[in-house]
A protein has these predicted regions:
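Conserved PLP-enzyme active-site core in the AAT-like
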Residues: 149-311
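Active-site C-terminal subdomain of aminotransferase-like
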Residues: 280-383
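Short beta-strand
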Residues: 37, 386-391, 429-433
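Conserved PLP-binding catalytic core of the aspartate aminotransferase-like
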Residues: 386-421
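PLP-dependent enzyme catalytic core of the Aspartate aminotransferase-like
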Residues: 434-502
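N-terminal entrance/gating region of PLP-dependent enzymes' catalytic architecture
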Residues: 2-137, 422, 427, 449, ...
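Short loop-beta-helix segment that forms the pyridoxal 5′-phosphate
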Residues: 128-152, 198-201
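Conserved PLP-binding active-site segment of the aspartate aminotransferase-like
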Residues: 353, 397-407, 426-456
C-alpha cells in the first residue's frame, strides 16, 4: 500500500484528514475581522523559513504550519466588513462539490476522461445560454475566469473578422475606459497593435456613449479598417454600470461587427426575479462572459464563455491524434477550450442549483443590489461624503470630503484612509481613480452585510479621516514650531488613533 495516494486502501485516512481540515477551517470562519492586517513583511519570514526538501512530521504538523503561513492571516470574504473587491462568500453546496472535484480529479477535456462531467458541463452551458436568451445553436465552455472568457470571445471575433475581411492588418476593438483591462491584454496576446483597441467615450452615467460608438464605427469604415468587435460591459468593475446593450447591438449589427458582452459581474442578473430586464439585449450578443465565481456565489474558479452560434468555437479548435482526432465520433470539450487539462468546476454550480436553487441565487444578488441603493440614500444625507454615480449593481463609489477639505486634499486623504483601514484589518474597502479623482469603493457581494454594518463602516472611514487630518495639522504645527526654534518639546506628544496606523 502507498500511504501517500488516495485509494480505497487509504480511504480511512482520507476521511480523518478531511475531518481535520474542515474542523480547522470552521474554527477560522468565526474570525472577528476580515483581515489581521498582516503585511508581506510580516508573512515572508515564516514562508521562507519552511524547508520544502524535508516534510513535516505528520498531517497535524503540516496543518499547523499552513495555519501560520496562510490560514490565520487569510482575507475572509464572507466577513460582513469585507466590502472591497468582487469577491463573494461562497455557496455551501459549491464548497462541498470542491471536495468531490479534488478527490475524483476529473479532467473535462475529452469524452473518454469525463463522460458524466462532460454532460454536466454541457447541460449547464445550455442552461446559461437559455437564461441569456440564445437559441438551440448556442454553445460554450467553462473557463478559469473572466479574463480567459474575454480572451476567447475576442479570439472568436478575430476569427470571424479575418474570415470575412481576409486579413488581420487593420482590426479594431471598441470598448470604453471602464471596460475590464483584460480586453487590452487580450489584444496584446493576439498580437494586435496597441492602437487596435479604441476607447469609446462614455456618457454621464459612465456607460458607453452610443452616439460616440456610432461615430467610431463610421470612422473605421471610412478609413478602410475592420471593426473586429464591440465590447459591451454588463457591470463595470469600478462603477457597476451596464452599457446600453440593446442600442449597442443595433449598431454592431448594422456594421456587421461581433458583439461581445462582458457580464462577468452583471451575469448574476440572469437569475434575478426583479432585475433581469437590466440585461435586455444580451440575447443579441455573439459571445457572453459570465463569472459564476462572482455573482453566482461560487468558489474560484468558475466562469464560462457562451456563444450564440456554436460553430464559431471552431476558431479555437486544434486536433491532436492522441487526444481529440478529427475522426472522433463524440465532440470533446477540448475542441472548444483554450485549455487542455481542465478541472470539473461545473459541478460546483450544478450542486448549487440543485440544493440552493437559481431563484435563491438571484435573490442573494438582488439583496446586495438593494443594499447598495440603501447605502446611497444614507450617504445622500451625509455632508461628509461625496458619491460618484448612482448605483446600478452593488458598487458604491464614495469619498470622504467634509466641509473645509478641498478637492486636492480629498484626493490625497482618501487613499490614506484606505491604507489605514487595511493596516488595521477590521474593515476592508477598495479604492480607485475616476477622472483623476481618488475614490473609495464598496463592492457589496455579501447578503450578510447589513445596512447597520455599512453605517458602521462609514463612521469608521470618517473617524479615520478625522484622525489623519488631526495628525496632518499637528505635523504642520511641529514644522512651524521647528522653524521658529521652539525645540523638540514645544508641543505635546502626538496623539494615536485607535486601530489606525500610518
Amino acid at each position: 500500500m502507498n500511504p501517500h495516494l488516495l485509494t480505497h486502501e487509504t480511504a480511512d485516512d482520507y476521511v480523518r484528514g478531511m475531518a481535520r481540515v474542515t474542523q480547522l477551517v470552521a474554527q477560522h470562519l468565526a474570525a472577528d475581522a476580515p483581515s489581521t492586517g498582516a503585511t508581506v513583511a510580516d508573512l515572508t519570514p515564516a514562508v521562507e523559513g519552511v524547508d520544502l526538501d524535508r516534510p513535516a512530521a505528520d498531517l497535524d504538523a503540516a496543518l499547523a504550519e499552513v495555519t501560520d503561513i496562510y490560514l490565520r492571516d487569510a482575507i475572509w470574504f464572507h466577513h460582513p466588513s469585507y466590502v472591497a473587491h468582487l469577491n463573494c462568500p461562497v455557496a455551501l453546496p459549491a464548497v462541498l462539490a470542491e471536495g468531490i472535484i479534488a478527490a475524483v480529479n476529473t479532467s473535462v477535456d475529452t469524452w473518454d476522461q469525463s463522460a458524466g462531467g462532460t454532460l454536466v458541463e454541457q447541460r449547464l452551458i445550455r442552461w446559461t445560454a437559455g437564461r441569456i436568451g440564445f437559441g438551440e445553436g448556442a454553445d460554450g465552455v467553462f473557463t478559469s475566469g473572466g479574463t480567459q472568457s474575454n480572451l476567447q470571445g475576442l479570439l472568436l471575433a478575430r476569427g470571424e473578422a479575418v474570415r470575412r475581411a481576409g486579413s488581420d492588418a487593420t482590426l479594431r476593438v471598441l470598448a470604453t475606459e471602464h471596460s475590464h483591462f483584460s480586453v487590452i491584454k487580450a489584444a496584446r496576446i493576439m498580437g494586435l497593435h496597441p492602437s487596435a483597441v479604441i476607447a469609446v467615450p462614455t456618457d454621464e452615467t459612465g456607460g458607453m456613449s452610443t452616439a460616440a460608438l456610432a461615430a467610431e464605427l463610421d470612422g473605421i469604415r471610412e478609413r478602410g479598417e475592420t471593426a473586429m468587435a464591440v465590447v459591451a460591459t454588463a457591470g463595470t468593475t469600478d462603477l457597476g454600470v451596464i452599457d446600453p446593450i440593446s442600442t449597442i447591438a443595433d449598431l454592431a449589427a448594422a456594421h456587421g461587427t461581433w458583439l461581445h458582452v462582458d457580464a462577468a459581474y452583471g451575469g448574476g442578473l440572469l437569475t434575478s426575479l426583479r432585475r433581469r430586464h437590466l440585461l435586455d439585449g444580451i440575447e443579441r450578443a455573439d459571445s457572453v462572459t459570465v463569472d459564476f465565481h462572482k455573482t453566482f456565489f461560487q468558489p474560484v474558479s468558475s466562469s464560462a464563455i457562451v456563444v450564440r452560434d456554436g460553430a464559431t468555437l471552431g476558431h479555437v479548435t486544434h486536433h491532436a491524434d492522441y487526444l481529440n482526432p478529427r475522426t472522433a465520433v463524440t465532440p470533446n470539450q477540448v475542441d472548444k477550450s483554450l485549455q487542455t487539462t481542465r478541472r470539473f468546476d461545473a459541478l460546483k454550480l450544478w450542486l448549487t442549483l440543485r440544493v440552493t436553487g437559481a431563484d435563491a441565487v438571484g435573490e442573494m444578488f438582488d439583496e446586495v443590489i438593494d443594499r447598495a441603493h440603501q447605502v446611497r440614500e444614507v450617504l445622500r444625507d451625509d455632508e461628509r461624503f461625496e458619491v460618484a454615480v448612482e448605483p446600478v449593481l452593488s458598487t458604491v463609489l464614495l469619498r470622504y470630503r467634509p466641509k473645509g477639505v478641498g478637492v486636492t486634499e480629498a484626493d490625497s486623504l482618501n487613499p490614506r484612509i484606505r491604507h489605514a483601514l487595511l493596516d488595521d484589518g477590521s474593515v476592508m474597502v477598495a479604492g480607485t481613480t475616476i477622472d483623476g479623482r481618488a475614490w473609495l469603493k464598496f463592492t457589496l457581494l455579501n447578503p450578510q452585510t447589513s445596512l447597520a454594518h455599512l453605517r458602521g463602516i462609514i463612521e469608521t472611514i470618517a473617524t479615520t479621516g478625522e484622525a489623519l487630518r488631526a495628525e496632518d495639522e499637528l505635523d504642520e504645527l511641529r514644522v512651524t514650531a521647528g522653524s521658529r526654534g521652539s525645540g523638540a518639546d514645544a508641543l505635546a506628544p502626538r496623539p494615536t488613533m485607535a486601530g489606525v496606523t500610518r
